[in-house]
């Protein structure tokens, strides 16, 4: 269906495809892999600095969802009723951190951005929401390695 849509068959509406796939997944007792194209949980998620920066620029500066969807993704998220997701990880830039905070209604401070950014650089994974929220309230200098160890041990 997605390929037909991308080839120009515009009478195909893809907004219900995810829900349909979830239903089939539950009936067949076969989970959809997180990295599955178009319908997997991570299909429109990125934490990579350059890719995320381009999407952020399209969404913030140009206010252009079309550009973010059609140029930076093989399948447009909006056609599936979804949106691009920017996460924070070891290869993220500071723009990922700022965008992530702003998307959640948090006005980022330089200190918050720096703490989260430095923590992410030492992590070996994409940060979870719990990890980022735990870092948001930190006010003083810190040892990112010690915090990383502490947060991952309690998770």
Task: Please name every model-derived segment.
Residues 1-11:
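Glycine-rich and small/hydrophobic secondary-structure elements
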Residues 9-155:
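A mid-to-C-terminal "edge-of-domain" accessory segment
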């Amino acid at each position: 269906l997605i390929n037909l849509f991308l080839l120009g068959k515009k009478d195909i509406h893809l907004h219900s495809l995810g829900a349909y796939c979830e239903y089939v997944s539950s009936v067949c007792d076969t989970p959809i892999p997180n990295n599955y194209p178009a319908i997997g949980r991570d299909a429109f998620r990125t934490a990579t600095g350059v890719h995320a920066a381009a999407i952020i620029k399209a969404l913030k500066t140009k206010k252009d969802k079309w550009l973010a969807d059609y140029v930076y993704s093989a399948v447009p998220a909006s056609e599936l009723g979804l949106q691009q997701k920017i996460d924070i990880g070891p290869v993220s830039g500071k723009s990922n951190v700022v965008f992530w905070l702003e998307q959640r209604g948090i006005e980022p401070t330089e200190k918050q951005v720096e703490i989260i950014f430095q923590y992410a650089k030492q992590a070996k994974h994409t940060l979870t929401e719990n990890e980022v929220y735990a870092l948001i309230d930190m006010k003083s200098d810190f040892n990112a390695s010690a915090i990383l160890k502490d947060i991952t041990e309690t998770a």
